[in-house]
Amino acid sequence: MKVLIVNPILYTNENRNIKKVNTIKDTMIYDLCLAFKKKGCDVTLAASDLYKPSENESYPLNIIWMRTRLTKLFPPHTLPYCPEVKKIAKSGNFDLIITSEVFSLNSLKLALCTPKNLIVWQELGKHNRIFHGLASKFWYGIVAKTGFKKALIVARSVQSREFISKYCKNVSDTIIDHGVNIEKFTPCREKDNQFAISSQLISRKHIEKSIEAFAKYLNKYDDSAKLYIM
């Protein structure tokens, strides 16, 4: 089975100046590609060239670094525009194409040119703040309703499914969340009395709210529990 995964944004940036990293092998989407690979699929990842790592790496899958255009108009950290995605999708004879987010210029191109074997994996559960939220409301209110009629949309959470169902009719009842690489995170039956949060330590993540909630848990239920922030 030939699978194309379109995910231009490989990791989070706070502004349009994309920071270079040494490797992409610690990203969620790379682990997803490996999971398909282990199932015997022929996997291709299409990503923005701005996210190409600074170090030369070898991969057990195909990676296409798409040229990112019009970066002054379309911020590459939130709305990258990679027009060659259409050519890649149509010329690769793929059995399945997975793209991230309805609010995406690249997803729109795919929804219009290869809708039959396309899955749009929707994470956002509320309007994006790009251009003060006006762009998001226009996109979902008009573009999503007309441009994504034939593509199947699969949400990553209940919140995102409820949100996208307001604008698109072809939303799957099945929710598929982010996976976990069990080679890095080994499941076990024995549990310790502790909680773990994986988050960036930046203001918009509001990690203090999680700490406050944990403090309430300690006071009300169990003051011996531990919290790890990673």
List the model feature ranges, each with a label:
Residues 159, 179, 191:
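Carbohydrate-associated surface elements
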Residues 3-6, 96-98, 111-129, 153-154:
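Active-site proximal beta-strand in glycosyltransferases
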Residues 12-16, 68, 119-146:
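Acceptor-binding helix/loop patch of EC 2.4 sugar-transfer enzymes
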Residues 51-76:
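Conserved nucleotide-sugar phosphate-binding/catalytic loop shared by glycosyltransferases and other
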Residues 4-6, 154, 188-216, 227-228:
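Conserved donor-binding/catalytic core segment of Leloir-type glycosyltransferases
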Residues 1-51, 92:
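N-terminal subdomain of nucleotide-sugar transferases
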